[in-house]
Amino acid sequence: MINDIADLIKIQSKNIEHYNKYPIALLLFIMLILEVPSSFLSESNESSIAFDLTFNLLNALVLTFIEAILFVYWFGRIGKNHSFLSFLRYDAMLSIAANIPVIAILLITQNFEESSWIAIIGGLIAVSYIIYMFSVNLALATGSSGKYAFGAILIVVLIQLIYGVLI
């Protein structure tokens, strides 16, 4: 599993069915465990850490299921039919792979004020890398074009923004 996560970080995804060998419960558990340091490192002053942690854990779980549903529909439109559980496993693996560099960036930028250029640039680098990593890996895993996978990721980002505003 560690090699597969490292490959995803290096943007060298295997076919989506390759990741079906991992139990979904384990993947979701690891994904949620990695939300804990993210919550502590990016805690806001407006609420308690317990609230932030609970909120982030629920968000991660709900959005992972929503993303898997979207991917089943989106890639099914072009004949790249994979099961919901395949996309759920793959999305959980991508989330694990994305959280590792984000935690590293949060560790580096936590010593700077939120309004400093270093924190802003670090945040932009993290967001850009995640969008790029998700898009390219998704294209490689499904055998679709990079533009089509990028469209799916843009829809995911839009859903996350709307979800974040409504909640």
Regions found by a protein language model. Give the residues of each.
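Selected alpha-helical membrane-embedding segments in polytopic membrane proteins
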Residues: 1-90, 95
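Aromatic-anchored segments of alpha-helical transmembrane domains
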Residues: 33-38, 98-101, 156-165
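Juxtamembrane "helix-exit" motif on the non-cytosolic side of transmembrane helices
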Residues: 39-47, 104-112, 165-167
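Non-cytosolic membrane-interface motifs at loop->transmembrane helix junctions
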Residues: 49-56, 86, 113-123, 149
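Mid-bilayer segments of alpha-helical transmembrane spans in multi-pass integral membrane proteins
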Residues: 61, 96-104, 124, 161
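A cytosolic-side transmembrane-helix exit/cap motif
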Residues: 73-78, 106-110, 135-145
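C-terminal halves and exits of single transmembrane alpha-helices
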Residues: 91-114
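Terminal transmembrane helical module of multi-pass membrane proteins
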Residues: 115-167
